[in-house]
């Protein structure tokens, strides 16, 4: 299969979306597929250094200077997509490259799948200070964009429910982004390495450690963690909070820690190298987050893969992820966070190896790649079915094809734009996928 991934955000820009796309690319290539990334130019990268990464001329996006917006080169992108003979397009943004991906898919008459990554209600205030787009407008803009895709990947149940509330009609599948487990399991990291890091950070023997690791922005709600941590210290003083990362809200947090008089128990590390991420997770007793703006949150998965339990604000996604007390504790109101921390410090059991291994496969990049590939197959089969149905047939012939769609593909399938899906049985669909897999090899 030849796959085009369209995104406004890719490395060297650092974000959860960029990480998710690179993970997907890696897993699809392991399965033997050819993957091409269509993205924006970047001043820190030679536009032509990788022939599988097609960079479209772009400028910084006015609301987010570290993000970019493509403004020309669309016809050239279509020409390249034709040359690469793409079978399917997978868009990862609702902005310039997302619109370009949908247009190219329609020109090539191939299906387009979209991943919805961001809850924009939490971010529209950045765009002209909320004067240009209001939160109430988001659902109409998103619904309009998704009207022209063949299916949507939702990284969590939160996103699926949100899009259902928006009255998005296309098929929605919950497929959480997986992570490369080997990057976080890291058996070469020994106890002495963890002890050395804790000593370097000023953590004493016998002290528990909470780790917050993210971009330091207001939306991450680290300020709520600091407030709760101040209450925790009144009950348990042998605990430290490590805040790792950098961002526009860092100085505000440092000032808040001073005002709460907890600065001696809070350690701000600044940005840490990606190669050290697993080391920090493993050196902590708990990963903690009070963010409510995540559609999934890869840091939760990274922490579990490192063997470190999580304390976080509960939601449908995390309710499924933190399915056992050994994986951590959830809370549902900011006033409950301090209590959740204290309970976790006292009552979290050790990790059970068997239960952990099952959870790790569930959140693995391998499982993620397989499930996305299955969605691609279903969309391609459906697209071929719709093309076949569109030929000059009589009404009776169309009905016959709908009921017994067996000519070249064996089965009828889901999804076509905003149209109702024709569902095949699970057995038929698996047979059809197997047929396509055989013909890809």
Curated annotation (Swiss-Prot):
Molecular function in Gene Ontology: 1,2-diacylglycerol 3-glucosyltransferase activity; hexosyltransferase activity; magnesium ion binding
Enzyme class, first EC level, given as a word: transferase
Annotated Gene3D superfamilies: Glycogen Phosphorylase B (3.40.50.2000)
GO biological process: glycerol metabolic process; membrane lipid biosynthetic process
Pfam family membership, one: Glyco_transf_4
Keywords, sorted A to Z: Carbohydrate metabolism, Cell membrane, Glycerol metabolism, Glycosyltransferase, Lipid biosynthesis, Lipid metabolism, Magnesium, Membrane, Transferase
Activity modulation comment: Activated by the negatively charged lipid phosphatidylglycerol (PG).
Known catalytic reactions: a 1,2-diacyl-sn-glycerol + UDP-alpha-D-glucose = a 1,2-diacyl-3-O-(alpha-D-glucopyranosyl)-sn-glycerol + UDP + H(+)
Superkingdom of source: Bacteria
Cofactor names: Mg(2+)
Entry EC no(s): 2.4.1.337
Gene Ontology cellular component terms for the protein in this record: plasma membrane
This protein's record includes keyword RNA-binding: no
Cellular compartment(s): Cell membrane
Main location: membrane
Keyword Ubl conjugation: no
InterPro entries to which the protein is assigned, alphabetical: Glyco_trans_1 (IPR001296), Glyco_trans_4-like_N (IPR028098), Glycosyltransferase_grp1 (IPR050194)
Function: Glucosyltransferase involved in the biosynthesis of the non-bilayer-prone membrane lipid alpha-monoglucosyldiacylglycerol. This is a major component for maintaining a certain anionic lipid surface charge density, for balancing the bilayer to non-bilayer phase equilibria and for keeping a constant lipid bilayer spontaneous curvature (curvature packing stress). Catalyzes the transfer of a glucosyl residue from UDP-Glc to diacylglycerol (DAG) acceptor to form the corresponding alpha-glucosyl-DAG (1,2-diacyl-3-O-(alpha-D-glucopyranosyl)-sn-glycerol). It can only use UDP-Glc as sugar donor.
Family stated for the protein in its record: Belongs to the glycosyltransferase group 1 family. Glycosyltransferase 4 subfamily.
Protein name: Alpha-monoglucosyldiacylglycerol synthase
Organism: Streptococcus pneumoniae (strain ATCC BAA-255 / R6)
Upper classification of the organism: Bacteria, Bacillati, Bacillota, Bacilli, Lactobacillales
């Amino acid at each position: 299969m030849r796959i085009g991934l369209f995104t406004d955000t890719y490395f060297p820009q650092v974000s959860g979306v960029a990480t998710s796309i690179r993970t997907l690319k890696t897993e699809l290539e392991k399965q033997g597929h050819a993957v091409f990334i269509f993205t924006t130019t970047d001043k820190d990268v030679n536009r032509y250094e990788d022939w599988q990464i097609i960079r479209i001329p772009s400028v910084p996006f006015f609301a987010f200077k570290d993000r970019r917006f493509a403004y020309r080169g669309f016809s050239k992108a279509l020409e390249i997509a034709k040359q690469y003979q793409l079978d399917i397009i997978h868009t990862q943004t609702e902005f310039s490259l997302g619109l370009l991906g949908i247009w190219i898919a329609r020109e090539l008459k191939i299906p387009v799948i979209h991943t919805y990554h961001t809850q924009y209600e939490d971010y529209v205030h950045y765009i002209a200070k909320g004067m240009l787009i209001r939160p109430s407008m988001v659902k109409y803009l998103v619904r309009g964009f998704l009207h022209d895709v063949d299916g949507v990947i939702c990284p969590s149940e939160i996103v699926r429910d949100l899009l259902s509330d928006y009255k998005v009609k296309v098929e929605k599948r919950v497929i959480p982004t997986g992570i490369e487990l080997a990057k976080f399991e890291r058996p070469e990291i020994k106890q002495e390495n963890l002890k050395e890091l804790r000593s370097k950070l000023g953590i004493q023997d016998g002290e528990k450690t909470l780790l917050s690791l993210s971009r330091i922005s207001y939306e991450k709600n680290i300020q709520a963690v600091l407030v709760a941590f101040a209450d925790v210290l009144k009950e348990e003083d042998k605990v430290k909070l490590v805040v790792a990362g950098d961002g526009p809200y860092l100085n505000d947090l440092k000032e808040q820690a001073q005002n709460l008089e907890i600065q001696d128990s809070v350690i701000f590390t600044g940005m840490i190298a990606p190669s050290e991420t697993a080391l920090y997770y493993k050196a902590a007793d708990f990963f903690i987050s009070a963010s409510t703006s995540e559609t999934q949150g890869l840091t939760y998965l990274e922490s579990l893969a490192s063997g470190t339990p999580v304390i976080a604000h509960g939601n449908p996604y995390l309710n499924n992820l933190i399915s056992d007390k050994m994986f951590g504790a959830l809370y549902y109101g900011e006033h409950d966070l301090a209590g959740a921390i204290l309970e976790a410090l006292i009552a979290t059991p050790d990790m059970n190896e068997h239960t952990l291994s099952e959870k790790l496969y569930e959140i693995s990049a391998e499982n993620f790649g397989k499930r996305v590939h299955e969605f691609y197959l279903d969309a391609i089969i459906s697209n071929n079915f719709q093309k076949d149905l569109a030929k000059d047939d009589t009404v009776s012939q169309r009905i016959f094809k709908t009921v017994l769609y067996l000519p070249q593909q064996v089965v009828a399938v889901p999804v076509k734009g905003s149209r109702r899906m024709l569902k095949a049985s699970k057995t038929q669909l698996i047979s059809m996928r197997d047929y396509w897999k055989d013909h890809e090899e």
